[in-house]
Structure formats: structure tokens, C-alpha cells
């Protein structure tokens, strides 16, 4: 299972880089920062499905 270290999130501003992550909600997040912010907002219910677009 793919995992991401989201310690230090959420962050108030994310970079614009595009390195997609596919979440367990079947949504593509544009980069680690956006994905980890969503994980923080989900109280741990959101996980990484795989790296790359969904």
C-alpha cells in the first residue's frame, strides 16, 4: 500500500506544481500539499489510493 507522510499539514498555501496523487475518494489531487491538506481535513478518513491521476 502506498503511503504519504502528511506530518506538518495542513498548510495555508500550496505550491502550483503538478505531481498528482489519487485519493481513496477517487479524486485526483494536484500535489502532495493539496492531498495532505485534504487528509488533514478528513480527520484521517482519506488515504492514498495510488500515485498519479485517478
From Swiss-Prot:
Gene3D superfamilies per record: 3.30.60.30
Top-level taxon: Eukaryota
Pfam families per the UniProt record, alphabetical: Kazal_1
Main location: secreted
Keyword Flavoprotein found: no
Localization of this protein: Secreted
Glycosylated residues in this chain: 43
Keywords: Disulfide bond, Glycoprotein, Protease inhibitor, Repeat, Secreted, Serine protease inhibitor
InterPro entries: Bifunctional_prot_inhibitor (IPR051597), Kazal_dom (IPR002350), Kazal_dom_sf (IPR036058), Prot_inh_Kazal-m (IPR001239)
Molecular function per GO: serine-type endopeptidase inhibitor activity
Residues of the Kazal-like domain: 4-54
Disulfide bonds: 6-36, 14-33, 22-54
GO cellular component: extracellular region
Site, as annotated: Reactive bond 3: 16-17
SMART domains hit by this protein: KAZAL
Swiss-Prot/TrEMBL domain comment: Avian ovomucoid consists of three homologous, tandem Kazal family inhibitory domains.
Protein name: Ovomucoid
Species this protein is from: Gallirallus australis
Organism lineage: Eukaryota, Metazoa, Chordata, Craniata, Vertebrata
